[in-house]
């Protein structure tokens, strides 16, 4: 199975390797365990392993993990996503799970990967539970905030605008990560940003997610779903694609990166599953 996917393992780091897929070459970090946590990023250039590290480092060694950098992010090479849709991205993730012979897993996703998660759950590999961290909803992605604003979100956006997106994000990484990890995160993101700046006009960084992608989603009632979100978004998620008869909302935090501020709660939940 692994040879079919053209896995290339690094001699120096047997847990990190690249997988050639139809959407591009993906950098993967993998550790075997009695149960496997699959972690998928939202938007942005941050490498997925480091993004979820505040959770991973709180888990016992018996729990394994799989993190995947999508094309043009983290450690994955540059590859235009022109002509590639969400279904193609889902299929690439599914092929990696199959290639590693993962028969069941816990899925932990942030932001935009929530939409990917709902499609991935329909694939024939058992998902024990979905942990969705402020997953993207159709309501928020296509909302007209001039008609129905979130005062709390508007306040956050004002704060980001005042200090600048990079300074805002750097403030969060500084209080979350040890100095060496934070330095590596910014080194990788800046390197990737420079590579992307050199691409020709029309280069597409990420897959487009359409309203039709949301319309085709369905969530089975037998899958336990845990949604971590800020308190002001509670109603949005109760009315969302992520709500079934087994959904539980866990409220907390005051920014979008709850995998950092709420990592203790998330790790405790994973240990219990």
Question: Would you name each region that the model predicts?
Answer:
Residues 103-141:
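Conserved hydrolase catalytic core segment
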Residues 188-245, 250:
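Conserved serine/cysteine hydrolase catalytic core
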């Amino acid at each position: 199975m692994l040879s079919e996917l053209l896995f290339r393992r690094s001699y120096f780091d047997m847990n990190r390797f690249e997988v050639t897929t139809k959407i591009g070459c993906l950098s993967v970090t993998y550790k075997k365990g009695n149960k496997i946590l699959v972690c998928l990023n939202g938007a942005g250039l941050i490498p997925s392993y480091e993004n979820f590290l505040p959770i991973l480092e709180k888990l016992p060694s018996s729990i394994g993990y799989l993190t995947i950098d999508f094309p043009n992010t983290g450690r994955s090479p540059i590859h235009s996503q022109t002509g590639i849709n969400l279904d193609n991205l889902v299929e690439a993730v599914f092929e990696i799970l199959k290639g590693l012979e993962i028969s069941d897993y816990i899925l932990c996703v942030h932001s935009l990967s929530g939409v990917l998660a709902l499609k991935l759950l329909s694939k024939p590999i058992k998902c024990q539970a979905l942990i969705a961290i402020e997953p993207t909803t159709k309501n928020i992605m296509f909302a007209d905030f001039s008609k129905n604003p979130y005062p709390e979100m508007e306040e956050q956006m004002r704060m980001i605008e005042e200090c600048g997106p990079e300074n805002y994000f750097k403030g969060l990484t500084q209080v979350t990560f040890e100095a060496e990890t934070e330095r590596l995160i910014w080194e990788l993101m800046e390197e990737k940003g420079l590579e992307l700046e050199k691409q020709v006009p029309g280069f597409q960084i990420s897959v487009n997610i359409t309203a039709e992608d949301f319309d085709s989603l369905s969530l089975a009632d037998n899958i336990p779903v845990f949604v971590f979100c800020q308190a002001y978004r509670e109603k949005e998620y109760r009315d969302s694609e992520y709500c079934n008869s087994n959904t539980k909302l866990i409220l907390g935090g005051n920014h979008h990166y709850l995998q950092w501020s709420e990592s203790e709660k998330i790790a405790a939940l994973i240990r219990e599953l």
